[in-house]
Amino acid sequence: MVTDIFSSMVFDDATMEARLPKETYKALQRTIKLGKHLDMKVATVVANARKDWAIEKGVTHYTHWFQPMTGVTAEKHDSFISPKAGGKVIMEFSGKELIQGEPDASSFPSGGLRATFEARGYTAWDATSYAFIKDGVLCIPTVFCSYGGEALDQKTALLRSMEAINRQALRVLKLFGNADVTSVKTTVGPEQEYFLVDKAMFDRRKDLIYTGRTLFGAKAPKGQELDDHYFGAIKPRIAAFMKDLNEELWKLGVLAKTEHNEVAPAQHEMAPIFTTTNIAADHNQLTMELMRKVAQRHGLVCLLHEKPFDGVNGSGKHNNWSISTDTGVNLLEPGETPYENAQFLLFLCAVIKAVDEYQDLLRISVASAGNDHRLGANEAPPAIVSMFLGSDLSEILEAIEKEAPYDGKEKEVLRIGVHTLPKFQRDATDRNRTSPFAVTGNKFEFRMLGSAESISCTNTVLNTIVAEELRQFADLLEGAEDFEGAMHDLIRGTIRDHKRIIFNGDGYDASWVEEAERRGLLNLKSTPDALAHMLDKKNVDLFVSHRVYSEAELTARHEVKLENYSKIINIEAQTMLDMTWRDVLPAVSGYTAALTERLQAKKALGLAADYEEELSRKLSALLANAYRAAGKLEQDLLDSKSAPDAEALADVFKTTILDDMRDLRIVVDSMETVSPADVWPYPSYGEILFGVR
């Protein structure tokens, strides 16, 4: 049963309470809930209890599990064994080993924070995230920092941002008389999209192996035109994978809830129940890792790239974000009468102001080479950041701005017209799937995040920008003689000054680009365009003032993101050249030679050879074009090495190299459409996308 296996591999609260002495358990809870310092004596007791629990489950090793700036997790395994006299060993795990580790920091991305010869780095236990057993190893969630204390990971800043929004939200809540609230946390439920393909097909595609996406591939006769895959019947192999995945996730305490087919062929989605943001980030990393591992067991490969196939939808990760108090109140819950809910309206305005003032940071938080293929491609939100509030909330805000009466709307009963079907109330607002940042009930759904990315960066930005607006609100209201009057003016002024960010229309419509420009909204189409704003003074001041990033830490992340962008495209370009020179051109050239021989033989016999003659001419022309296109790409890659700095190099890849790759792909894909299947060196889109039955 699910209840028997759920969290069975997690040293969770129930396990701690059962295994720890009462005073130790209370001390640990004070650390987790209030951020109190953990005494080494307490850590030693906790470490020993964890070790005993893990050994009972067959564990021999432990690891400090952390999230460097690579976007994936890292771990180094150490055994529990310790030598004793007589050549024997005992199993030990000390408080110091629990609290602190020392991996090599020089081999991870640091953005200049560490030189290659400066190898010392530290991992430190994140007591707010439960330890778990994975692949027979006790995993201890940790943060990762340099010898000088600079954050080298994704989690440290996330935890700092959670503290920032907690501090500022508590200030605002106290003004409303919420004396019983002691902490505020953000919660997240990230919907994870992915593709599953047959491993035999995957193994024959160099591009999938090296880059995670197809760099060549002519469109299959059928794609997603019929909308028959979305929510369609799940195929047996996929269903078996999903069942296996759910069980593995449940054992690790991941609240896997929903599974279904997505829009594109071979595309699927898994959505979890909400949990505290840093735990959600850990769980999402585990989810992506387990998706890959479980797929292998079923003869499948899980593709998490944002755009693995051209011509069909790519994959995203919808980041459902909300703010809640420790008393169980969702601060983004409108309630039955949102127009009378001043606390809700104030927090809503903080989010509106944050999104408007920091459009650039939200775009930066989702910027990657892979996600650039997806954003603005009529399958995902545009690269322009805007907010969807729906008609009800928009009308309320308009009434407040104009100081006009708002009578409210009674909830409408939806009648379908069949007497045997139940009646139910229509939601206050429809869903807008084209909006990057949309209200969906009592949360915001940020849809720009790419499927392969960690959710840590995005939520670090979200938490920090909202914390900043709450700080400004608290500063103003705390000193107000007339609190209600000042709050009314603040809400009204915020709506007036920031309503440009609200757009309830079709984000896919070309006219929105022009309208957004008229409104003064940013349209940062590519990763380099977005990263050009990362170190703007207002952004540096924001993170430094809330102690989320130092200027050096932010600069390092800018450098890592910029370098990663160029490195990814370089790998893709080199892979294209390898496939072109070594596989495509030899295969098509050989076939053209054979075709020419057949053409000459037919002509010698006086037979009609129109097909052979036309195809030979067409393939010869395409071969020549492919040869030239590959040569240009190769030369431009060589020339790119002379770029003076990381920004210039990224610009070369954004324009010249990506254009070269597009030109080469067009020619090669055209060759595929007229080449026999047994000649073409790679499985086709049709074979890959429809190969799992």
Describe the role of every protein-language-model region:
Residues V42, F66, S94, P272-F274, ...:
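Active-site proximal loops enriched in glycine and acidic residues that flank catalytic Cys/His/Asp
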Residues M1-D12, I32-K33, E150, P221-Y230:
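Gly-rich Lys/Arg/Thr-decorated short loops/hinges at beta-loop-alpha junctions or inter-strand turns
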Residues G71-G86, S106, G111, R205, ...:
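Short linear, low-complexity motifs centered on an aromatic residue
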Residues M1-A14, R167, R171-K174, S391:
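Flexible inter-domain linker/hinge segments
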Residues E118-L304, N313-G316, I323-E559:
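Glycine-rich, acidic/polar active-site loops that bind/position phosphate-bearing ligands
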Residues V42-V46, F66-P68, K96-E97, F144, ...:
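Active-site-proximal loop/turn and secondary-structure-junction residues that shape catalytic pockets
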